[in-house]
Amino acid sequence: MVVIVAPSPTKQDPDPNAVVAFDQLVDASINRPARYMGHELGVEPRDWEAARVRWALTYPEIYEVGSSNLGHIILYSILNAVPGQLCDRAYLPAADLSERLKERNQALFAVESRRPLPAFDILGFSLSYELGATNILAMLDLAKVPLYAAERGDLPLSHPESPPLIFAGGPTATSNPEPYAAFFDFIALGDGEELLPEIGLVVAEAKAAGLSRTDLLRDLAVVPGVYVPSLYGPDQQGISVEPLEDGLPDRLLRRVATPMPHYAMGLVPHVETVHDRLTVEIRRGCTRGCRFCQPGMLTRPARDVEPEAVIEAIETGMQRTGYSDFSLLSLSCSDYLALPAVGVELRNRLADRNVTLQLPSQRVDRFDDDIAHILGGSRQSGLTFAPEAGTQRLRDIVNKGLTDADLVDGIRTAMQNGFRKVKLYFMIGLPGETDADVLGIAETCRMLLDRCRDLGRLNLNITISNFTPKPHTPFQWHSVSTAEFLRRQQLLREAGKRLRGVRFNFTDVRLSAMEDFVGRGDRSLAPVIEAAWRAGAGMDAWFEALDRTYEAWTGAIAAAGLEGRYRALELGGWGRANALSEEGLDAFCSQPLPWDHIDTGIDKGWLADDLKRALEAAVVPDCSFEGCSSCGVCGPDLGHNVVIAPPEIPVQKPRQAPPSDRVCRIRFRFSKTGAMALLSHLDLVRLFERALRRAELPISFTGGFHPLPRLQLALALPLGVQGEGEWMDLEFIEQVEALQVLKRWQQTLPPGLLLMEAYEVPVSGQSLSQQLEAARWSFELKTQ
């Protein structure tokens, strides 16, 4: 065995475009080093020299978050399928690697090619959270790219000293790009599946022609769905923006694309990720019309995926990846009418693979026995529903379309199907909310406990979020004070003390106030964002960073002279709708907003009318299943709702526990060398288990709630240690030939893991740990 020791750091500045000396940067002294390895299962070699345009899609979060983001992986896969285009990935490194990069004057690098990010033509950032721009600035700084678009010069992209084009996409960038506009050369609005390849073609032609950066951006500005902030400036009122040159659209329409589930099979990371499963999108868009919900407004029309395409993607993806779990994704999964049929068909086809289906938060009014039967598997977990409000009046105001009877029926159905833990999401601070509505949350919990008592013990986990108004929603004109949030939280805490079996979790109000201030801001916030980042803001969605984040943001806001504006918003400065006459409300809602130039397809007048309906607690039906609400989306530009009729539900095969017979035990000697030494023991075991699934070997599983392969490793190697003679046992449900198993399993393992020997041992014999006598170690010592 050999302990890997990193050589002393180089004293010379590295070549800005050369492949990074990865082994000198990442070693066992770095926390969770395997997340930086790249070359995951599913990565294919790319020809750097042959590519006409080179992308790096960056997710401004740590690897475990970014690598499991479905949109990130889909766009990466699509770009790599386009001839002449190459796409790599990058993520925000943790603090220890960030410091090492700075110490060694090394630019942040992409995980596959391991080339510095300035070597790419285009760097794309996913912006899905109002405070996420601080992470983007941290990555730009680590990449040695100027923070502001205006500082990146006018050299052609083909020039070796030209910085990459920097762009943002994602829901936050689409809804209101103005607070972040100064940092980006362009913004990709809406769905990127078709838009990004088009951008790549324009960039490739501009590179070949030697166009300046300015001319290239002018060419990009005429691509539908591309917003170039430098070509737009404030209008006469200084709130909205308008084109600075002729020929540019006054309003920029977002792009809409059809979901492509076969691109979701993606990659299998070496480490455990936040969403450690195969995920396939079944429906894009939501037409429920919840008045607080920005994703529902930004993704219309609703588009169902063909059931057979979903089934094929899951079946093929589970075989390719070896995952034990899969998830079907949509803003409202239960509105995908084919869900029960697709779920049963998948359960039947994958019945012998010991897999579990998971769904995100669902509509409780559509949760029935058909959906309950397809959930879970050998590892049934809890369920999540989102009533949002505690009274019928307030649910009507927000257009939730949910009654107490729906809630009771859904929870009882869940309990009748074996679920005992249910998570419920509520919000406080919604427009029109009173103390009675807040206390109604506790009353709703009490009602559910009482109405379900005959079915056994019910455990409720309640998450209370603070409502923050979002652009392009009917509630974009509203605001609630921080003081009111705190008072209402305390009101609910007191009421919740009397409830047994109910646990309340509250969102920090400081975070909500900052999200609101930035999310509805304008271009004047760019220096505030930079100042907050320099003061220590970053990883702002993480609870551990909250105190530091709050101090950094409030300090930056005060230093910019915007504290008065921040406090006015915090005190409810926009929450005047209830007090206005109809004429006054019309005038109030017609005032310009910083995001008016972004055309989501929904008419601003319709949003104002829907706000009026909210004040009257009037409900608007779901236009996917009832009449058109005339929001303005459907038409030749954005298309129409695509709702697929539900197929017949197949007969479901009985659930069966994974096979646990112990017929044959094979002992393996293996080596773990090279980069695999950076893999922790738990990650190694997970890698072996997934490889076994891909090899489709007749393995034996343990019993109990969480069945696992009967795989035993003799020793857990310390992180960073290579092993040249490790041992493990694996048991099978039938007699197998050791050499054939070795060959079949080896085909599914990555370089650095080599099965060297295999032979049968008695099933009832001693375990490996009992038979170990000694281990031989060798150390390579290097002087600094």
What do these predicted ranges mean?
Residues 26-56, 63-64, 229, 234-279, ...:
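N-terminal [4Fe-4S]-dependent radical SAM core
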Residues 92-241, 474-522, 529-545, 550:
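Glycine-rich beta-alpha loop elements in corrinoid/cobalamin-binding modules
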